[in-house]
A protein has these predicted regions:
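Active-site metal-binding loops of divalent metal-dependent hydrolases
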Residues: 87-88, 114
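A contiguous, well-structured pocket-lining segment that forms one wall/lid of small-molecule binding clefts
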Residues: 1-82, 91-105, 132-135, 154
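Short, conserved alpha-helical segments within structured domains
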Residues: 50, 90, 117-121
């Protein structure tokens, strides 16, 4: 949808772009989208072009932070190669912009072929499958006790 939109139509904030750390938070951007849609009369009142323009504007603001902070972190930690991976690597504009920024700054850059971009959950599931295949007598996986709210322990 964002590919069909005008990324400049709705100027949106790029949260934490100028913070000195390398953290990300898109809560301000999400709130800006919420208010924008509300001010335009609600989602059901938006035509397809406006939806595409909002998506493109959101993508533009989000990627600006992601690309900028990635390059700054690579410089700061003296990284030689930037690797784009995980589900986010399927975003065509991110692939283009991060590759260009890395080249301009003199970093080696790598990303998977588009057909290999996938959600992190799929990668974790595949790793679990291979681990189970390597050691099938590791127990009955159907009797696992799963706690989705398990906290981290020291």
């Amino acid at each position: 949808l964002a590919e069909l939109g005008d990324p400049e139509r709705f100027p949106l904030p790029s949260p934490m772009l100028n913070s000195k750390d390398f953290n990300f938070s898109y809560s301000g951007l999400k709130t800006a989208i919420l208010y924008l849609v509300r001010d335009l009369g609600g989602l059901e009142k938006l035509d397809e072009q406006t939806k595409a323009d909002i998506a493109a504007s959101f993508q533009n603001a989000a990627l600006r932070v992601l690309v900028d902070k990635t390059i700054r972190a690579a410089r700061n930690f003296k990284i030689k190669t930037i690797l784009l991976s995980g589900g986010v690597s399927a975003n065509k504009l991110l692939r283009e912009e991060l590759a260009q920024a890395a080249r301009e700054d003199g970093f080696a850059y790598s990303q998977p072929e588009f057909k290999y971009t996938t959600d992190n959950a799929a990668m974790i599931a595949l790793a679990g499958y291979f681990a189970y295949q390597a050691k099938p007598d590791s127990g009955d996986w159907q009797k696992l006790d799963i706690d989705a709210n398990l906290g981290f322990q020291k």
